[in-house]
Amino acid sequence: MRAEAPIEEVVRDADMRVTSIAVDHDDVPAVAYRIEHGGHAIVVSGDLASKNDNLVRLAAGADVLVYDTAVRDPPGSAPGLYSLHTPPKRIGEVAAAAHVRSLVLSHLPPAVEHAREEVLASVRAGYAGPVRFANDCMRIDLPAP
């Protein structure tokens, strides 16, 4: 994957726009998506190691960034996973650099689930906005634009 990929339009109609960008997931192709509707934007990272700023560009100013949180900070997860997934400290840095309004941590394996306080503290070291852990059927209400 190129260090800086273009943002591509996937869908556009009168009410909604979906864009995507290639993200770093070792040698496995992966993309992140931005969904815009009604004056709001939600970005879903997909699996990524975040070794470049592609997600920062796609997520710029988003209301919500849903971020793959499949590893703990090193050495808390298997070494091979760090070429595929973003450590919590870097997640906080990406969210702050993109100036997102809130962050939802998703794709939570047991190692992350059992270390929520540690993971949250690490994310908050770089990002001061609201942070939530995702759960099935979660609903996020957004204020009127």
Regions found by a protein language model. Name each.
Residues M1-R57, D136-P145:
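Core dinuclear metal-dependent hydrolase active-site scaffold
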Residues A41, A49-M138:
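Cap/insert and terminal regions of metallo-dependent hydrolase folds
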